[in-house]
A protein has these predicted regions:
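N-terminal intrinsically disordered/low-complexity leader segments
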Residues: 1-9, 20
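Amphipathic alpha-helical linker/stalk segments
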Residues: 2, 62-88, 120, 141
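Helix-turn-helix
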Residues: 13, 17, 21-55, 59
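Amphipathic alpha-helical packing segments from all-alpha helical-bundle domains
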Residues: 73, 86, 119-146, 156-160, ...
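Hydrophobic alpha-helical connector segments
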Residues: 73-104, 149, 158, 162
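Amphipathic alpha-helical segments used for helix-helix packing
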Residues: 100-119, 171-179
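Amphipathic C-terminal alpha-helical segment
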Residues: 141, 159-181, 193
């Protein structure tokens, strides 16, 4: 049988294959047999990691979310970050580059899984998507640090404008047919100024 994965990392190979299948053919097309075939392993091999399709889907969502959140945390805690504004800028850049480097993740998360978010800046919601909640908290911190008095409505609009810019740039960055002459690292930094 053809070996399409790195030995010892079948679980992650199955997750990546699952994301590709979902993005190409939809969630209904996902099966443990199909991810096994995509990885070039026996049909029984995925069962060592996932008892059923639902557990694979759950692992896909968890993996993508954790990878994304980890990137944002690294950005927010970077050595050049001195305040909330710096954190937001570096998180925004990392957000865009993460999805530029992982376009299948963007489609999976925002078009297939549809994570829950609340744009009310006055409180956290327990079901909010963790990376979004982190972004929202830093934006709230920025509003506090800036000393600018904003109404709840103005804060919510600020969140939507900021998130919309980053989300839109991430969507464009992940498109195969977009051929920018400037690197996305530079574009992300310049567009977020």
């Amino acid at each position: 049988m053809k070996d399409n994965y790195h030995h010892g990392d079948l679980r992650n190979a199955l997750i990546e294959a699952g994301i590709k299948i979902i993005n190409e053919s939809g969630e209904d097309a996902l099966s443990l047999r199909k991810v096994a075939a995509a990885c070039g392993v026996s049909h029984a091999a995925p069962y060592a990691h996932f008892p059923d399709k639902e557990s694979l889907l759950s692992a896909i969502k968890e993996t993508v979310t954790n990878d994304f959140l980890s990137e944002l945390e690294k950005a927010a805690n970077g050595s050049k970050v001195k305040n909330a504004q710096d954190a937001i800028m570096t998180m925004g850049e990392r957000y865009i580059l993460f999805f530029r480097n992982n376009p299948d993740y963007f489609n999976f998360l925002f078009h297939k899984q549809k994570p829950e978010v609340h744009t009310d800046m006055s409180k956290d919601y327990p079901n909010d998507y963790a990376p979004f909640l982190m972004f929202k908290r830093y934006l709230n911190k920025y509003f506090e640090e800036s000393g600018i008095k904003l109404s709840a409505k103005e804060k919510e609009i600020g969140l939507i404008k900021t998130w919309g810019l980053v989300q839109g740039l991430s969507s464009i960055a992940g498109m195969e047919n977009v051929n920018a002459t400037i690197s996305w690292k530079v574009l992300a930094k310049e567009c977020l100024k």
